[in-house]
Amino acid sequence: MSKLLSYTARIILRNSRTTVRQLGQEGVRGFAGFVSGQRNAPQPAYGRPVPGLLRQKMVSSIGKRSMFIQTQDTPNPDSLKFLPGVEVLGKGNTYDFPSGTAAHCSPLAKLLFRVEGVRAVFFGSDFITISKEESAEWSLIKPEVFAVIMDFFASGLPILHEARPNADTEILDDDDETVMMIKELLDTRIRPTVQEDGGDIVFISYENGVVKLKMQGSCSSCPSSIVTLKNGVQNMLQFYIPEVESVEQVFDDVDRMADKEFERFEKNLKQKEPAGAPVGIGGGPN
């Protein structure tokens, strides 16, 4: 009797093990089928697999837009320095575009002037300085400038079609010793410092002890440009070149137009002020 019970127990145990094993295998197969079904099932719109061609286009687009562009403030609140992380014009070279009409020799400058609010463009060795209209907001301009710079460098087009940067300080056959020394100092001592602030100084002429220079980039409309010119540039030139008596800033037609507009704005502002209004430290009403 005990042997029969033992034999019956072994059969029941064997059958139960088989059942558990089968259930386990079926469970695994069922789970695998569920996962497979989920993979093949239609996905919601936000999670749908990207078609092959579209995926290739996206990868290509991401590759083109992998440039990391940094920005750097300048002494001029209306000018911002963009550093794309690649060479722009090369070491020591600069090119100024005070207006859109001057951008005929640069495809990149033309595109940047299409951004609403951009007033001037300046290329340096490894940076691009954008000067905006006073009423424009950087929060609106910066994203568009980023996109233009990234797309342009991905295209492989030349930055300049013609004209040589820094032709103003090239030593000419008819330059006398004083002019040669002025150009040398500008290139080696003065320009590198000014270019760090997103601007440049261009040599115009030297006559009767007077050096005439033009400010470009962020320096062209910077409130402290006159101080920089007199206290910095003039002092250095006079220290090394005794023949230099003074330094004067030269303005082009675009600069003169901007100054006239500012003077007109100030005049209109004063006319709108009530008579006898108290004047504050800055010259405006308290």
From Swiss-Prot:
The UniProt keywords, alphabetically, are: Iron, Iron-sulfur, Metal-binding, Mitochondrion, Transit peptide
Originating organism: Drosophila pseudoobscura pseudoobscura
Q: Where is this region: Disordered?
A: 267-286
Family, similarity comment: Belongs to the NifU family.
Explain the purpose of this protein: Molecular scaffold for [Fe-S] cluster assembly of mitochondrial iron-sulfur proteins.
**Keyword Metal-binding, does the record have it?**
yes
> Where in the sequence is the transit peptide found?
1-15
Q: Which domain of life is it from?
A: Eukaryota
- Kindly list any coiled-coil regions of this protein: none
Q: Name one Pfam family in it.
A: NifU
Kindly list the positions annotated as binding [4Fe-4S] cluster: 219, 222
Name of the protein in its database record? NFU1 iron-sulfur cluster scaffold homolog, mitochondrial
- What SUPFAM superfamilies does the database record attribute to this sequence? Fe-S cluster assembly (FSCA) domain-like (SSF117916), Hypothetical protein SAV1430 (SSF110836)
According to its UniProt entry, the protein's GO biological process terms are: iron-sulfur cluster assembly
Q: Which GO terms describe its molecular function?
A: iron ion binding; iron-sulfur cluster binding
Q: Where are the annotated segments for NifU?
A: 182-250
User: What is one GO cellular-component annotation here?
Assistant: mitochondrion
Output the PANTHER family linked to this UniProt entry. IRON-SULFUR CLUSTER SCAFFOLD PROTEIN NFU-RELATED (PTHR11178), NFU1 IRON-SULFUR CLUSTER SCAFFOLD HOMOLOG, MITOCHONDRIAL (PTHR11178:SF1)
**UniProt subcellular location:** Mitochondrion
